[in-house]
């Protein structure tokens, strides 16, 4: 991937709502600074087509003394409505991480949001002919490029990096960890996977055995601790699949703490966006165990 250009679009300061946490010191409102920029990048899809598009990066940083560790927060995927939302912000989730002292970068990848493209660079093929590897490469290569951009910011500590993601973004986080970018300390996977469809195949992802192999491959090269969070009633990836993926990852040498939470609402796949009070304590413990207090 080649970074071609960068453009500053907006800047704003807003306050995070108070979110109850275990530590009294963290139970406070915090002002954070938000910016929106675009990177022009080139990727190669599963058909070997070169696609140039824009990655919109929404970034948040705390007030106070820097440098701040970097956190890249990766979104999931809608195969039918990729232009929505216009950009991913994850404001509530970003506030949680900013309160813990992170500079947070949320990329809206090529093919999504206001700059959604055709062809779709993350197209992984039909359900019976999935190429999960190509999707992982396209998405993770963009994360690496965003990380390079983040490292250029004067307020970051490039030696301390965490990659986080939900759904396809969680899959992308583990794929990125397998590349061992400089400074990476840990990765967090919320309901990570690909090929799920709760309407046509509830809980049963397309060609899950290929995903199991992908996670095994990731485990052979990944060196940092990872945290995996799934739920009993995930309508995209049932527990039998997420547990098999975790086992494949660990058996191949990956370091992973697996958490299977009870059923959440109608679809546990939405835990990251709607169930913060359930996952925040788990993530807090993991971050503290890896030097982010």
PLM features per residue range, with description:
Residues 186, 192-252, 257:
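The feature captures the conserved acid-bearing segment of alpha/beta-hydrolase catalytic domains
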Residues 26-65:
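N-terminal cap/lid segment of alpha/beta-hydrolase-fold proteins
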Residues 250-293:
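C-terminal catalytic histidine-bearing segment of alpha/beta-hydrolase fold enzymes
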Residues 74-76, 230:
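The conserved beta1-alpha1 loop
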Residues 66-68, 76-116, 238:
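Short substrate-entry loop that stabilizes the transition state in hydrolases
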Residues 122-154:
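Alpha/beta-hydrolase active-site loop
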């Amino acid at each position: 991937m080649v970074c071609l250009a960068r453009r500053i679009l907006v800047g704003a300061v807003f306050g995070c709502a108070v979110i109850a946490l275990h530590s009294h010191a963290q139970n406070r409102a915090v002002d954070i600074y938000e910016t929106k920029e675009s990177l022009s990048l080139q990727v190669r899809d599963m058909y070997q087509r070169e696609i140039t598009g824009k990655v919109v990066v929404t970034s948040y940083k705390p007030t106070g003394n820097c440098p701040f560790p970097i956190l890249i927060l990766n979104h999931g995927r809608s195969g039918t409505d990729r232009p929505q939302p216009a950009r991913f912000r994850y404001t509530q989730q970003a506030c949680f991480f900013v309160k813990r002292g992170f500079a947070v970068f949320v990329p809206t990848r090529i093919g999504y949001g206001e700059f959604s493209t055709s062809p779709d660079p993350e197209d992984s093929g039909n359900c019976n002919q999935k190429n999960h590897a190509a999707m992982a490469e396209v998405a993770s290569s963009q994360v690496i490029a965003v990380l390079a951009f983040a490292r250029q910011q004067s307020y970051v500590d490039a030696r301390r990096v965490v990659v986080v993601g939900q759904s396809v973004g969680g899959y992308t986080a583990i794929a990125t960890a397998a590349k061992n970018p400089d400074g990476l300390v840990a990765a967090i996977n919320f309901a990570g996977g690909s090929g799920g469809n709760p309407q046509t195949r509830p809980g049963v992802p397309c060609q899950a055995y290929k995903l199991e192999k992908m996670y095994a491959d990731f485990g052979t090269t990944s060196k940092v601790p990872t945290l995996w969070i799934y739920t009993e009633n995930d309508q995209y990836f049932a527990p039998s699949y997420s547990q098999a993926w975790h086992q494949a990852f660990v058996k191949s040498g990956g370091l992973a703490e697996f958490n299977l939470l009870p059923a959440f609402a109608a679809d546990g796949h939405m835990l990251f966006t709607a169930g913060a009070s359930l996952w925040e304590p788990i993530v807090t413990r993991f971050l503290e165990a890896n030097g982010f207090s």
